[in-house]
């Protein structure tokens, strides 16, 4: 069970992190080289956003790709009318705390292409150095800028007792949208995770203050849940409404580990309701899991009743399945 949960955690984390490819840490000291930008197939609906990609390197060597939605208002000098019109030269700048990208090229017919130069912000680098984090390389500063990392993130981490982050840690937090506001939200919900990796994991799985609060409101056993419990809830789809359903069905003391096991093995409120209708009320959660593991279904129980086997115990049902008994077959 534990190995399975750890494996699922790793698989889910890998899937969630694949959408943005940040530079490999071993490449941090290499020069950026040419930065290419690209806008392709801009949505006809004008929502003030544009999907913009930045790429460095040639082929697979020293290559990094960043693709994200940007507010057009943040791309100083680029307008929707330029993107919608006929092809024309354009210039724009993307300015962030860690540095600025000055870009040129051509745009029109809902697409665009060109190159950029990057200038690290010396003041931002100086603040990181003064905080004991270190001075970012040009490539790291570029990553910090595209990941929207602000210095208030460093301050908020310190305020809530996190280990001092590295520059790479800050990039990872930025990629996954862990802002200063998110750090505070999690802290206000009672979680100071200590390690930046734990905060990234929370963000990957969508754990926020509302989710924590909704769980805590269900009952005392869901207050002060461990960080691992919260992550496993997200991995296996244990939602507040699911837990409330079980508590209303006669399981007010249901615990986090039972919930995860039930989700893994396919126990559902519908399954519990079917069993109750057949005379099996308040079956212990571990027995519910055993029934599902061994393929005891409502149809199996109904078929037994038709053969005159009235209300065997959960243990007897499991033994019948283990013995290979099939109602209607001799």
What label would you give each PLM region?
Residues 4-13:
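Sec-dependent N-terminal signal peptides
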Residues 16-330:
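General marker for long, soluble alpha-helical cores
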């Amino acid at each position: 069970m534990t190995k399975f949960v750890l494996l699922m955690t790793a698989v889910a984390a890998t899937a969630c992190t694949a959408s943005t490819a940040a530079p490999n840490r071993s490449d941090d000291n290499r020069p950026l080289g040419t930065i290419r930008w690209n806008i392709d197939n801009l949505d006809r609906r004008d929502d003030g956003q544009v999907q913009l990609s930045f790429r460095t390197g040639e082929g697979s060597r020293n290559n990094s790709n960043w693709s994200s939605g940007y507010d057009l208002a943040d791309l100083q000098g680029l307008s929707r009318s330029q993107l919608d019109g006929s092809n024309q030269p354009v210039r724009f700048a993307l300015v962030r705390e860690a540095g600025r990208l000055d870009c040129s090229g051509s745009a029109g017919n809902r697409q665009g292409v060109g190159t950029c130069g990057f200038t690290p912000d010396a003041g931002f680098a100086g603040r990181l150095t003064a905080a004991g984090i270190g001075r970012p390389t040009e490539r790291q500063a570029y990553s910090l800028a595209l990941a929207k990392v602000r210095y208030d993130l460093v301050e908020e981490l310190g305020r809530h007792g996190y280990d001092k982050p590295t520059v790479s840690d800050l990039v990872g937090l930025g990629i996954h949208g862990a802002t200063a506001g998110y750090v505070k939200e999690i802290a206000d919900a009672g979680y100071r995770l200590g390690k930046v990796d734990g905060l990234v994991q929370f963000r990957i799985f969508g754990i926020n203050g509302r989710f924590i609060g909704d769980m805590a409101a269900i009952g005392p056993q869901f207050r002060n849940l461990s960080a691992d419990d919260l992550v496993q809830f997200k991995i296996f789809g244990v939602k507040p409404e699911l837990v409330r359903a079980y508590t209303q069905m006669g399981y007010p003391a249901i615990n986090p580990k039972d919930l995860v096991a039930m989700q893994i093995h396919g126990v559902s409120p519908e399954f519990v309701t079917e069993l109750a209708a057949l005379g099996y009320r308040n079956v212990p959660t571990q027995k519910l899991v055993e029934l599902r593991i061994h393929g005891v279904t409502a149809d199996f129980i109904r078929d037994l009743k038709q053969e005159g086997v009235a209300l065997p115990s959960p243990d007897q049902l499991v033994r019948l399945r283990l013995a290979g008994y099939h109602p209607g077959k001799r």
